[in-house]
Amino acid sequence: MRPINILILSAGTRNKIVQYFKKTLGENGKVIATDMSTIAPAIYEADKYYIVPRITEPGYIDIILDICKKENISGVLSLIDPELSLLAENEEKFKNIGTTVIGSSYELCERALDKMQMFQWLRSHGYNCAKSYVDKNELNRLQLFLYF
């Protein structure tokens, strides 16, 4: 059976998440972590770690793809929101090397980053959620109405 190797991107201070994956995988795989900082404590919990550039740097995805190939990564996930969109946008590249992107579709990642767009989608699909406002004046008018 192929080992289940997981790559956790932008691990930062999320030690418990790295520990959880290590405990769950046990001897059946490894946890590899990345971060742009050598003082990100979670990378030191992993079986192996890589220091990588910022996600906005040119060639970032190619570096991550190289790590996936080198470490025989089964699944890759990020712990920061903007990187989720980046992974989803490049999902086919990961699939082509045998790595599964663990996350939502690009469209859903982008929607989740836009509070008003997410609010409108939730409402249009029948979900109850708190009212959201884009126009500060609209909110002020509502507050005045509620106080009088």
Stretch-by-stretch model annotation:
Residues 36, 54, 106, 134-137:
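Residues that form or immediately flank small-molecule/cofactor binding pockets and catalytic motifs
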Residues 1-102:
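ATP-binding N-terminal substructure of ATP-dependent carboxylate-amine bond-forming enzymes
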Residues 38-41, 107-111:
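Short gly/pro/ser/thr-enriched loop/turn and capping motifs at secondary-structure boundaries
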